[in-house]
Each structure stands twice: as structure tokens, then as C-alpha cells.
């Protein structure tokens, strides 16, 4: 494998593994900023070593073990938290006895809980929505500050500052690295879903720049939504959001004409709609319905989008059902935009 191919592989591995790597480290260290820094250190070492040694059989486990060693080195240098240092030393010794199996357990066993903690921490309500979005894409999406800046068409230093300030705010406020419980989870989940949907919308209908759409952001939001749905299978509104994004994303190829101008929904060539994404969206919507309870705004919007997706032509659209769904949506989230669409 050439150096270029190895670097491409490392980039792909990072996109896949970075979120749970950071999440696992944050669980141990209780410091999201330090966890990301150590994960980045492990990435740098991989970039230095893998072109010579080859990509390991379990690259995620290799990165986790390397990051843990960096954590031990750092604690040894700083002579802080000696008890935690000893704990990490014992853990590393155990991994050396059975590196592959222990590293896999570190990644796979607590993966769900760790990732949920990271999601809820990155989207904490004390952060501005802009900060939540930047931190989420950085920690969970595996994007660099440059990639985030280019996606939102803002200077890279601006994104970097948002991320730095967000991590400082979390540390200063001593935000607990945990999944919220009880009634708090409803409000906190709204914050998470809002951040993911904002990323999707910025890709679906860009608010800046010359391009009407930025598909990369839509893909990042969909990936995050699908992961969250897998981690919270009993949360109907998570499935509602995933259904909404899947169905909306299915129209991407039909939304722009040859000149780059938007095409209204009723004028789109429905043969260009992605039936696979529509199928996924309808399945997510059905899962939300099966879970029962009062439908939230995302599930309602997904149900409206499904009415359009099921119609072979604009003339076959079930406008009666759409009107009824908008009436319910207006009660759940009253807003001028909803009333305008309802009219």
C-alpha cells in the first residue's frame, strides 16, 4: 500500500472511529477537551507509523491503546491525579497481556453509553447553537476545523474559536459527562435534535454562498441521526427526525436545475427521487409511530414529507391528510412558518 493509500485509509478510519475514541477517553478522563487532544495525538502517531508498519488489523483498538498511553505519559509528566494514573497503568498492563481483546472491549462494550454521553455533552444547552453545531461536527462527525469552516463558509479561526470556547465553557461549568435522566432528558434531547437538524438544513438550503445545497452537511447530519437512533431506539422523536431527513434528502437530485437554481417541490421530476432514502425514511417514520405517544414536531414533519414521497405525481398528493397534519403541527409548535405552509 502506497503512502497516499495509507493516508486515505487513515482518514477513513478516523471518520469511523474518532467519535467513539473520543467518547471512550472522555469517560475515563472526564474532560472532553483533553480526550479530543489525546485522540488527535494518536492520529498523528498513526500518520507517522502506519505508512512504514502498515495499517493494523484493528485500527480503532490501536488508536485507543495509543491514546491511553499518551494519557498515562501526560499524567506522569504532570504528577496529577495519581490514583487515576495507577488505574490507567493497571488497565494498560492488562491490555498488554491481551491487547486485541481488551482494546476491542474498551471500544465496543461501553460504546453506546459513551457516545450518548458525548452527544449530550457536545449539545449542552449552556452552549450557543453555533457552538453546539461546531463541537458536534468536530467531536462526533470527525470533521476538521477547516472542513467545518468551508462547509459553513466562515473563516477557519472563527470555527476554531467557537470550539475552544465551547470546551472551555463545559469545563468551567463542570458539566457532568453523563446522559441526562428523568424529565431533563426531554429538554436535552430537543437540544441534540435541534443541532443535528440545523446541520442538515444548512446543507439542504444553504444560507450563505453561491450554492443552493451542500450535500456533505446533509450526509453528516444523516449519519449522526442514524447513530443516535441506534443508541436511543425507544425515542420516537429521534426516529421522526431521521425519517424527515431521509425523505428530504431523497429529493436532492431533483431540487436544482442545470443552472443551479432551485426547483419547487411540485415541479420536481419525481423519477429523480432516491427510492432507497424514501424507503429508509418511511421505515423510520413507522418506527416512530409504533413507539406511540404524542407525535413531536419532527415526526409530524416527516409524516407530511411522506405524503409527498408516496405520491407518484403532484396531482396524486393527499392534500387532505397534509392539511390535517399541519393543523396538529400548528398546535405542537405554533409559528408563522407553520401557519404559512398550512394556508
Regions found by a protein language model. Name each.
Residues 2-23, 33-36, 186-194, 198:
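A short, charge-rich alpha-helical start-of-domain segment used by transcription regulators
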Residues 39, 50, 75, 152, ...:
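DNA major-groove recognition helix of helix-turn-helix
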Residues 13-32, 45-49, 120-124, 205-208, ...:
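Amphipathic, Lys/Arg- and hydrophobic-enriched alpha-helical face
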Residues 83-130, 138-147, 154-327:
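Amphipathic helix-loop-helix modules that constitute alpha-helical solenoid scaffolds
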Residues 43-44, 57-86:
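Σ70-family region 2.3-2.4 aromatic/basic alpha-helix that recognizes the −10 promoter
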Residues 17, 59, 162:
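Residues within the DNA-recognition helix of helix-turn-helix
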Residues 22, 29, 43, 167-174:
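C-terminal flanking helix
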Residues 25, 35-46, 63-66, 166, ...:
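Short, small-hydrophobic-rich alpha-helical interface motif
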